């Protein structure tokens, strides 16, 4: 059995913490031979964990790609706006790519990357890890088996969780769409992908409403300050207090471990005192929506209502799939799927085992599938290939376009046509390839 050799571009939370445990557990399947990471602490931590030598370490992806081809594939886990250039350069150099979602925050770049992967005959797989979880696999199986007849409508709720929202989308890296992507893409492209996968048809119309309503300077309480540590008069009662949130035990609050490296108590306090995670949630440079709804119609007549909210107790996804012969209700947090059959009145509740791997088994699942696809030379139309993912990305871009235009209905056929590659993919080159 051939051992697949990988290089990792971006050794942060996803590149290191999410995907490397699989590599460490299955060294005969996959081996990491290099890492490119600008942060020295992260680079050295990665090297120690994966037993890499100094010759296998690179500060930038450009430095790595200037070398002769070293391995089979790259795992690219940079920030959203830094996906396009390394991906195109890697594909052009003959590498297969596993790319963290979203593909890009620019729809033209998404279209071009998919076209280049096809032209080069390379596998470009997108990290839509939810498709690989036992929960969503079971949901898809029940629908495909006809358990509820023909699907008519779907209600899909993404409950972001009030603390997760404040951490990632008010104070964190995804707070501003000029730094990352719109919320519907940065957070909800998983959901757009799942919806497209479950419906199994192209989307024809999209309409969306939403806004940044609460986390704004005009809603800052009287007596609040720029930072939670500046003598804020309401810090002790504020649900978003950085001191209360980030100084908790990191074993019970995983977000607290993300603001400092290593996440010692002293380092976390320094991060609160001087970094973005200590800012008042009403006084940051955030601009992404805190709630949004999307209505969709598909070619097969299915209608979908999607809701994303940052104002929920739990981080959860709740889905209701309504068919001609029954109904399915799924609760991701409890990992239960409730099937009701109209003809018999029978209700069947299935408890889905929860994997210890990240994203309820999805992180391991996508690594396993990517390695298998490479070993068996499956490069086109895989479960989360760029070909499969592009449609859901365009749905997200269309939803944002609608939201910014007062909920105007977007015709998806015309929308897709507007993002055809501006030039032939074969003419798209980067300096790194010259």
Predicted regions and their residues:
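N-terminal Rossmann-like dinucleotide-binding module
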Residues: 1-52, 434
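Predominantly a Rossmann-like dinucleotide-binding segment in NAD(P)-dependent oxidoreductases
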Residues: 12-15, 130-279, 406
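Conserved acidic residues
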Residues: 33, 55, 72, 152
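C-terminal helical cap and adjacent loop that interface with cofactors, partners, or active-site loops
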Residues: 50, 288-434
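Conserved SAM-binding strand-loop segment of SAM-dependent methyltransferases
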Residues: 54-60
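Beta-strand-loop-alpha-helix segment that lines the small-molecule cofactor/substrate pocket
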Residues: 67-68, 73, 79-80, 84-131, ...
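Glycine-rich, N-terminal phosphate-binding loop of Rossmann-like dinucleotide-binding domains
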Residues: 77-78, 158
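Alpha/beta-hydrolase fold catalytic core
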Residues: 260-310
């Amino acid at each position: 059995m051939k051992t697949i050799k990988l290089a990792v571009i971006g050794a942060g939370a996803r590149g290191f913490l999410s995907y490397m445990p699989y590599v460490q557990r299955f060294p005969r399947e996959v081996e990491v031979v290099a890492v490119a990471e600008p942060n020295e602490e992260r680079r050295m931590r990665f090297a120690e964990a994966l037993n890499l030598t100094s010759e296998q370490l690179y500060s930038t992806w450009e430095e790595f790609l200037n070398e002769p081809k070293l391995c089979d594939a790259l795992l690219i886990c940079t920030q959203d706006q830094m996906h396009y250039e390394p991906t195109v350069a890697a594909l052009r150099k003959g590498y297969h790519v596993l790319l963290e979602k979203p593909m890009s925050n620019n729809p033209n770049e998404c279209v071009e990357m998919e076209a280049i992967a096809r032209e080069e005959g390379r596998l470009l797989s997108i990290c839509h890890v939810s498709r690989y979880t036992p929960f969503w696999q079971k949901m898809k199986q029940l629908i495909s088996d006809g358990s509820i007849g023909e699907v008519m409508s779907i209600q899909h709720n993404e409950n972001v969780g009030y603390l997760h929202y404040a951490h990632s989308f008010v104070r964190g890296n995804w707070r501003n769409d000029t730094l990352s992507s719109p919320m519907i893409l940065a957070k909800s492209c998983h959901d757009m992908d799942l919806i497209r996968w479950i419906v199994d048809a192209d989307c024809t119309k999209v309409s969306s409403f939403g806004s940044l309503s609460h986390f704004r300077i005009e809603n800052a309480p009287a007596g609040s300050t720029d930072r939670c540590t500046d003598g804020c008069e309401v810090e002790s009662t504020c649900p978003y207090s950085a001191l209360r949130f980030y100084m908790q035990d990191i074993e019970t609050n995983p977000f607290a471990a993300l603001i400092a490296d290593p996440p010692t108590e002293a380092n976390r306090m320094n991060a609160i005192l001087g970094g973005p995670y200590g800012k008042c949630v009403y006084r940051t440079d955030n601009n992404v929506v805190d709630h949004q709804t999307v209505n969709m119609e598909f070619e097969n007549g299915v209608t979908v209502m999607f809701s994303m909210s940052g104002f929920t107790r739990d981080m959860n996804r709740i889905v209701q799939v309504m068919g001609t012969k029954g109904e399915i209700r799924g609760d991701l947090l409890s990992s239960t799927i409730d099937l009701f059959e109209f003809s018999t009145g029978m209700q069947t509740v299935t408890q889905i085992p929860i994997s210890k791997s990240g994203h309820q088994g999805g992180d391991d699942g996508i690594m396993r599938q990517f390695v298998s696809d490479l070993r068996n030379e499956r490069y086109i139309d895989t479960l989360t290939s760029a070909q499969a993912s592009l449609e859901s990305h365009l749905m997200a871009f269309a939803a944002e376009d609608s939201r910014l235009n007062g909920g105007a209905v977007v015709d998806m056929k015309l929308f897709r046509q507007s993002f055809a590659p501006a030039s032939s993919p074969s003419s798209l080159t980067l300096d790194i390839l010259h």
